[in-house]
Amino acid sequence: MQDYAFRRLREEPLLLALLTYWEGKRGDREVPDRRDIDPTEMPPSLLPHLCLIEICEGNRLKVRLVGTEIVRQHRRDNTGKFADEYLKGEYLAYLTALYLDLRARRLPVLAESRFRHIDTQLETTRLLVPLTMGGADVRLVLMGQVFRYRSGQANAPIAQPLDAGLLEVLNQIPLDRVKRAATPPPPPSSEADAPS
């Protein structure tokens, strides 16, 4: 599954740019902090596809920021709202489990799902990366999201909110390969290894 996930990321340059940026910001740490993130350092084409979610008390998800492409595709701006204020049922349960799993693992997650509506079908790929908020606990998730319509359909938002359709979860893959030790490599063990 890891090979598949990284192949999908190579096929989605915006999501790969987010992962590369996140890895650069974390350095030797397991997870970067929110204060390390500066949108002006990101590719401008990525910004409309970003969403910042806070995991609050009681495991409620609060939308802190939503990019314009996500607003356009979802047909609403949920900035400042809790997910349970505008989502219900299966979709809310899916998203909550996705974010809580990321928090527990402290790893990026690639998630793919499909929404089926009467007149259209849409697939979406999300890359979720964890962030701390001034402490050790993962409290924020920075998500990049891209949308793909079935062949022959316009890349325009559907006539109703995404969650009004039937949800099909395709993949949810923690990216274990990006986890690395926080300790630097040992120095050369002998004089033969040292540069002359």
What is the predicted function of each stretch?
Residues 160-196:
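Intrinsically disordered, low-complexity regulatory segments
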Residues 2-165, 196:
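Sensory/regulatory domains in signal-transduction proteins
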